[in-house]
């Protein structure tokens, strides 16, 4: 990491945003903070709340723990499927195309967590120092792409403070 960071700095790069993802080296707030402490504060997080949701973590609590380390944010939601997750837990080996049988699914923004939750999430990200863009990631296979994008954009417009 230190060689990579030195190379990035030589190239004029000021920040590296690592997206936390289950099963990788950086999958939580604590793993990002540990890597950052061992290397350089130019490393921060590309905060994807859906990835924390499917692990059972609280993205709002994570945003608070990551004060000053949030370099980018995704607008991406996930839904824990009632009944299925209750019996099988959150570990999901099935492909995303088998949405009817999965214990969780990526869904359009507002179709997992409600709009009040999203308002709080974006508010906390802002309070913790993030004032950048939000990237919409649309991976909802329970509706058409157009419906998912439109649903997500509508939800994001209602929840991101201007």
Task: Give short role names for the model-derived ranges.
Residues 1-44:
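Active-site acidic/histidine proton-transfer and metal-coordination neighborhood
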Residues 3, 31-34, 120, 151, ...:
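Alpha-helical elements of Rossmann-like donor-binding domains used by nucleotide-donor carbohydrate transfer enzymes
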Residues 7, 34-35, 124, 155-159:
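A generic secondary-structure signal
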Residues 16-18, 43-47, 71-75, 132-136:
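Hydrophobic faces of well-ordered beta-strands that scaffold small-molecule active sites
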Residues 19-23, 48-52, 76-80, 137-141:
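Active-site beta-loop-alpha junctions enriched in small/polar residues
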Residues 29, 33, 53-130, 146-147:
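Gly/Pro-rich active-site loop or hairpin
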Residues 145-162:
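C-terminal helical cap(s) of enzyme catalytic domains, especially alpha/beta-barrels
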């Amino acid at each position: 990491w230190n060689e990579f960071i030195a190379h990035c700095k030589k190239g004029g790069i000021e920040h590296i945003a690592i997206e936390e993802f289950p099963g990788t080296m950086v999958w939580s707030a604590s793993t990002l903070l540990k890597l950052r402490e061992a290397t350089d504060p130019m490393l921060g997080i590309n905060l994807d709340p859906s990835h924390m949701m499917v692990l059972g973590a609280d993205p709002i609590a994570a945003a608070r723990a990551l004060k000053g380390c949030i370099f980018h944010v995704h607008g991406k939601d996930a839904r824990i499927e009632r009944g299925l997750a209750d019996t099988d837990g959150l570990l999901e080996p099935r492909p995303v195309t088998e949405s009817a049988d999965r214990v969780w699914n990526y869904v359009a923004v507002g179709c997992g967590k409600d709009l009040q939750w999203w308002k709080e999430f974006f508010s906390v990200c802002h309070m913790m120092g993030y004032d950048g863009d939000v990237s919409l990631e649309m991976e909802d296979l329970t509706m058409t792409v157009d419906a998912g994008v439109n649903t997500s954009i509508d939800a994001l417009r209602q929840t991101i403070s201007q």
